[in-house]
Every structure is written in C-alpha cells, then in structure tokens.
Amino acid sequence: MSIPNKNEEAITRVKHLVYSSSDAVVQTGAIDTLATFGEPAIDAISEIIGLSSISDGVKEHGLKTIKYIKENSR
C-alpha cells in the first residue's frame, strides 16, 4: 500500500469540495485550485466535469483549464 503524496491528498480534498457543493462559483474556484497542481490534476478535473450535476459553465471552465494546463506544462 502506497502512502499518498501531498498533491494527491490536496486533490482529493478539492474534489470533495466540488462534490459536496452545488454552487457553480465554488466549483469553478475548486477547478482553479486544482489547476495549481498542473498535470496531476487533469484526471481530477476531467472526472469533475464529467458529472451530470455540473453546470455547462463549470464544464466549459474545466475544459479551458485542462487546455491551459496542457499548453503550459511543456
């Protein structure tokens, strides 16, 4: 069993924030927070924007964030 690193723990906490809130402002802020983790956060953001309960605006913001991370991680 591996010990989770700090990034994984933080990503889990931010994802929990999104799942426990239906507020688009909170969800968008959480995606922005995830973006600070760079590449490791892409899967988390993809999972979040794949939820049926997420608004179209948040999904669009998530897709833009993933694009930004990919373009700036090289």
Segments (PLM) and residue ranges:
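Structural detector for internal amphipathic alpha-helices that build alpha-solenoid repeat scaffolds
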Residues: 1-5, 16, 25-39, 57-74
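Core helices of alpha-solenoid repeat scaffolds
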Residues: 7-11, 42
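Buried hydrophobic core positions in alpha-solenoid tandem helical repeats
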Residues: 13-15, 45-48
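Short inter-helical turns and helix N-cap capping residues of alpha-solenoid HEAT/ARM repeat scaffolds
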Residues: 22-23, 53-55
